[in-house]
Each structure stands twice: as structure tokens, then as C-alpha cells.
Amino acid sequence: MGFSQNVLGTLLLVTSILTGVAASADTPPAPLAINSDDSVIDINTTPASLELSSAQDSIATNLAIQNYLSAIDQQENEAGPYDPILSEMTYGLGNTLQHNHRYEEAIAAYKRSMHLHRVNDGVYSLSQVPMLRGIIKSHIELGSINEASQSYHQLLWLHMKTYGENDVRLIPLMDEVGQWHLETYAQMGRRDDLYHLQASLRLYSSAIDLTASQLGSTNLQLVDMLNNFALATYYRALHERLYPDAWGNPGGAPFGYRPFGFSEETLRRGTHYLNGLASYRNALDILENNPDAPIQDKAETYAQLGDWNLLFGYPDAATEAYHQAHSVLGGVEQKDLILDALFGAPKMLPRIKKQPVVSSKVSKKPGNNNDRLSVLNERYVNVSIEVTSEGRVTTIDILKTHPENAPELETRVKRSLHSSKFRPRFADGHAVLTSDFTMKMLTPH
């Protein structure tokens, strides 16, 4: 049964209310400005007007959600609990709840929508994918990393059941989930987060093996995956050094995965540097022998190889790789622009190569007062530092801390900067000292 006139009318009312909320969010009382170098945040909205506007939005949103729920109940009463229309309605409700930072309620709505799709479309239907992505995003916003990880694995498992384990359509998802695990470890780095490194290494190894076997060993898609695999082995070497007793209880492999490429035994032999070096050399071979490879990708990969050597304590090898990045650009029209992007300012290491994430149709409209409040609640320290030609920080000046009077944040940032390495700035082909370099350091709760 389709929509009744009453249900349709209710949904039109909900849409008009939500449109009004979005319009008010898109035209805030005053703009929020974040300057381009991220060194200073200027909130141009007074707290009073921000609170008033936020309260008005909250009332309108609550009314819209209540009407949405009423429409869902009415449709269920008229068409039954498994009517396909309900899956779309509950998914839309989940998006609305998520947009308004009501993440636990959003997860419940997404799960109901996903269940309805399983009933109507089949257990392995990819129609569940948008709901799973909504669940993942909500768990991440809540800081529920284990739950987000489980949902990511369910997403991968669903694609494997649909396509099989050797289908090239798995490659972008393996890359995406591998990158998420790598970034999650980079942000957390606790003893028990070893699991994220294991998952990332398995996924990248699987994606590399599948790409090479199905698309060819010189396919350009391999380059970024090889570089991120190398970075994951660096983090593993670092984890082994920080937590030498962590290897006795590594945790189980996520379901739906099977190992490819490097074995666990090989990865535990202390050959992390050699494994990563082999990945970078493989990436460079692909770029050197592929006439379609962009020249800037070659320069960037040499720069990343330099970063890799710097992180492992081989400054001479790092300098050689940085010089090779300069050399491959000889005679290139955009040479100065590319070099400025790579070496025009110090870059904190390590750097993860970002990949585009598949859209889940879950959008976040700009200008929402909740977004402005989240910026107000953000914890950060603005600093001015001096970076030597060897990539070490020697001087740190605190410019601003938010929230104020938080010496523990300043201590964390200083400790992090002193222990970090930077790709140094280059001028006229040589690494040079950089003074008064400003940075914004985010400090997670």
C-alpha cells in the first residue's frame, strides 16, 4: 500500500519544518570565521544570540521529528510493520536525527531501516549500505570506536557476500576501511589499539594483492595503497617499541577477512623497515614505468620515502629521497608550485595519504548552530615553533589555548611536538631552518 493522504500531508509538514530549520541554520545571526592558517579562531556570534538561535532550531527540530514519528506510526498501522516504504521513512528519520547530533536515536532508526531492507530485499542486499554508513558515522561521532569498527567489518562482509572475495569492486572499500583503521590508530595509539594496525595491514595487503592480480601489477591504484601500507608498518614498529609485551595477545582477526601478501610471522621479525621500503620502491617502480603517471605523484612519493627514512632515523637516506623529489621535476612547467606544496613549509610526520570516501547520502548542512557550538567546544593549542633543517622542533611558543587556563593541554602539545619529526622546509634545493612557524594542534578529549 502506498502513502495515504494523511501520511503524505504529515510528511509534507515535516519537510517544510525541516526546510525552515535548514534555512535558519544557513543564515546565522553572524558568520563563523576560521582563518586560512588555522592559527586563530574568531567566533563572530555572541553567546546570547547563538543560544537563542539554537533554542529556536531545537524546538523546530523536535516538532519535525515528532511529526516524522507520527507519520511512520500511521504508515505502519495502515500498511503493516514490513511495508517497504517504512524503510525509507526510518532512514530519513535517522538522517534527520544524525544531522541534529542525536546519534544514539539515529543508530536505532538506521538499524530499523536496515532490518526492513533485509526482510524485503534479502540478507545480503546492498540496499543496507546507506544505513550501515549512517551507523558508522554516528558511532564515530559518539566516540564508540569498537562499535564503528564492527559496523565497518559488517559493511565489508556484506560486499564480500554479494560480490565474492576476488571482485575488483571490493578494492575501494578495502582501501577505505584500511585507511580508517590506520587513522584511528594514529589518533589513539594505545596498547590495545594494536588491533587497528592488524586490520589495516591485512586490508591493505588484501587490496594490493587483489589489485595486482585483477588489474595488473603496474596499476596506478596501487601507489597510494602501497604508501599507506608502508606507513602502517611504521606504526607497527613504533607500537612494538612502546609496548614490547603486546604481542602475546594480539586479538582475533575480524570476520570476513583472509590474509594476503605478508604473513604475520614476517611482520613480527623486526623487518618493518624493510617491508615499508619494499612498498615504496614498488610504488616508485610503478610510477617510473607508467607513462600516464602524473609527475607530481612521482615527486610526492619520493618525498614520502624521505619522510619514511626520517621517521626510522636515516637522515642521509631521507635527504637523498628529498633531492630525488626535486630532480624528477626538472623541466616541468609547474615545478615551483609542486615544490612549494611539498617543501614550502615544514610538515609534521607521519602523514597519511587521504582517499575519497564513498558517499552514504548522509549529509551535514553547513551553518548549523550545533556545528558552531562544536567549534566553541573544540580543544586546541595554537603554537609558534622553530623547525631545524633536520626536522626537529627546538622552540615552542604557546599563542593561544582553548579552553583557557588548561596547562595540561599545553604540556601534552609540547611533549608531542618535542618527540615529533617534521619534513623540513626546503629553499633553493636545500633543507633550511624555519622560525615562527604557526600550527593549530587539536587535542582530543
Each model region followed by its residue ranges:
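Charge-biased low-complexity segments
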Residues: 26-28, 32-38, 62, 80-83, ...
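Residue signature of alpha-solenoid helical repeat architecture, marking inter-repeat boundaries
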Residues: 84, 126, 168, 172-175, ...
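Helix-turn-helix repeat elements of alpha-solenoid scaffolds
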Residues: 57-73, 102-113, 145-157, 193-209, ...
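N-terminal leader/linker segments that initiate helical-solenoid repeat arrays
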Residues: 22-92, 96
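Eukaryotic all-alpha helical interaction scaffolds
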Residues: 75-76, 117, 159, 211, ...
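Gram-negative bacterial Sec-dependent N-terminal signal peptides
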Residues: 2-23
